[in-house]
């Protein structure tokens, strides 16, 4: 891309040189024409004024073309400098254009990291050398153009003064011819002296007015040059503001994309957090279930059975509930499930102290109920 900009600079350089040669040729032709006009009479000078006007129009057109080409050259040169800065991140350049045409421009190397590849560094140095050559040539070109314009302006002022002096002399001769009489020599002498004094006064007044006009013209020319410089600065600032606006637009797009990405990450983070909480809750439920089945289930059931047995004993003592000793094995099974070891010890002692009417079948049924209760406890003691 930098090579493309350098090629564009070479094309603009050739065009500017051609226009400068044409401008110099017109300036030299006008200078030689003025020297020839000095040797001719006033009538011949008036006859050649038409050619001078055409050359002046051509000169102004060339000046306008050169100004547009200079602006294009400056823009392309700035683009090449910016492109070099983007192409080589280790390099940072800053072009300082001189506010005056007689002061050289400056190209500051703000940052340069020499710790890079040798081939890349050599290419960078070569392109930087080309850019420096174009910067120096651009300064010399502007200086040459300003010098030609200043000489042209001086020649125009001198030519205007010369035309004015010739016109004054021509009218003075006509005035002498018209008012020449046939009076005596003394009257002619006095009249010629009076005419000479009048002519001198007229010349002095005319020169004074001319000087004032020249001074005003110089002020206007300086104002025009200053306006041109201000316009150039405004164009440069406009280009800079346009580039800054483009960069801010790119930054805004990047910030919007970043904000969208942050929102997506936040939503994903909330979802992951919710999943983690659900996983922890499920883990706590599983641990609680294992603790209940392995540790807390039997003590809780035993405590409830003892509590119910205690209140049942109180109710039986108070006579509110009747005790049925001859209940079936199916009704005694829940109590035998909880205190199977106690029944195992009490059955041997009760076998000797049982009433005479207890039969062997009742004892066997109780043992079967105890065995079934123990088997039920063992079979249900799992997750």
Swiss-Prot record:
Residues 6-26 form a coiled coil. The keyword Transmembrane helix applies. GO terms for molecular function: SNAP receptor activity. PROSITE patterns: ER_TARGET. Residues 1-275 are cytoplasmic. Keywords: Coiled coil, Endoplasmic reticulum, ER-Golgi transport, Glycoprotein, Membrane, Protein transport, Transmembrane, Transmembrane helix, Transport. SNARE required for targeting and fusion of Golgi-derived retrograde transport vesicles with the ER. InterPro entries: Sec20 (IPR005606), Sec20_C (IPR056173). CDD domains: SNARE_SEC20. The gene is SEC20. Its main location: endoplasmic reticulum. The keyword Heme does not apply. One of its GO terms (biological process) is vesicle fusion with endoplasmic reticulum. It is a single-pass type IV membrane protein. This is Protein transport protein SEC20.
């Amino acid at each position: 891309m930098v090579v493309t900009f350098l090629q564009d600079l070479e094309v603009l350089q050739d065009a500017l040189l051609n226009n400068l040669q044409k401008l110099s040729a017109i300036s030299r032709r006008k200078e030689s024409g003025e020297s020839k006009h000095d040797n001719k009479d006033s009538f011949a000078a008036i006859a050649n004024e038409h050619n001078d006007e055409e050359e002046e129009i051509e000169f102004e057109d060339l000046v306008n073309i050169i100004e547009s080409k200079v602006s294009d050259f400056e823009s392309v040169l700035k683009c090449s400098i910016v492109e070099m800065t983007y192409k080589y991140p280790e390099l940072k350049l800053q072009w300082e254009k001189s506010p005056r045409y007689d002061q050289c421009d400056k190209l500051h190397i703000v940052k340069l990291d020499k710790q890079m590849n040798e081939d890349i560094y050599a290419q960078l140095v070569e392109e930087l050398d080309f850019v420096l050559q174009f910067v120096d040539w651009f300064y010399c070109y502007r200086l040459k153009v300003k010098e030609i314009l200043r000489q042209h302006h001086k020649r125009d002022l001198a030519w205007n003064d010369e035309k004015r002096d010739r016109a004054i002399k021509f009218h003075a001769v006509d005035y002498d011819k018209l008012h020449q009489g046939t009076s005596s020599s003394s009257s002619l002498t006095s009249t010629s002296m009076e005419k000479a004094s009048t002519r001198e006064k007229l010349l002095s007044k005319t020169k004074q007015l001319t000087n004032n006009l020249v001074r005003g013209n110089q002020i206007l020319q300086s104002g025009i040059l200053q306006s041109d410089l201000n316009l150039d600065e405004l164009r440069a600032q406009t280009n800079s503001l346009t580039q800054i606006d483009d960069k801010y637009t790119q930054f805004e797009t990047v910030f919007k994309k970043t904000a969208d990405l942050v929102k997506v990450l936040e939503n994903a983070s909330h979802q992951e957090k919710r999943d983690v909480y659900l996983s922890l809750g499920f883990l706590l439920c599983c641990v609680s279930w294992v603790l209940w089945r392995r540790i807390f289930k039997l003590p809780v059931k035993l405590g409830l059975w003892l509590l119910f047995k205690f209140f049942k004993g109180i109710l039986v003592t108070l006579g509110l509930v009747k005790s049925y000793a001859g209940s079936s094995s199916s009704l005694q099974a829940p109590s035998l499930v909880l205190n199977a070891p106690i029944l195992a010890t009490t059955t041997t002692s009760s076998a000797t102290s049982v009433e005479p009417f207890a039969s062997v079948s009742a004892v066997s049924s109780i043992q079967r109920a105890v065995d079934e209760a123990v088997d039920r406890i063992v079979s249900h003691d799992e997750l």
